[in-house]
Amino acid sequence: MKDLRYGIEIEMTGLSRGKAAETLAGFFGTRAEHTGGSYDAYAVRDAQDRVWKLVSDGSIQTQKKVRGQTVHADSTYSVELVSPVCVYEDIGTIQEIVRALRRNSALVNDSCGIHVHVGAEKFDAQHQRNITNIMASKEELIYKALQ
């Protein structure tokens, strides 16, 4: 487990992509760059020169807080954080990034999700089949654990 490579995508709302990018840049002590494109993306480099992206996701029901009330927000409040290729030692960094984003108004709702991509180079077909079967049989338990 500790020698696997992975990537993570975390969907959120409550703050704009620009504010999320500035939060991430502040965390890393770098700067945010608006790269635009079809996902209206922002890019932030970390100390290892890896690029973290903040992109839009059309499936997110955008919201923000106004005077303590959660209200509908425009599409700039659709935020998906896309990590670079990560390793086990990055788990603490990811936790701290999420905390920083939450301190700056990030929130989630039922339209938000987390996607974890695990490098397959260490798994043969039987391993992949076993993992798929475990995930399928424990899907409800995993879902409850993430709520």
Positions of predicted regions on the chain:
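Phosphate/nucleotide-binding catalytic core
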Residues: 1-147
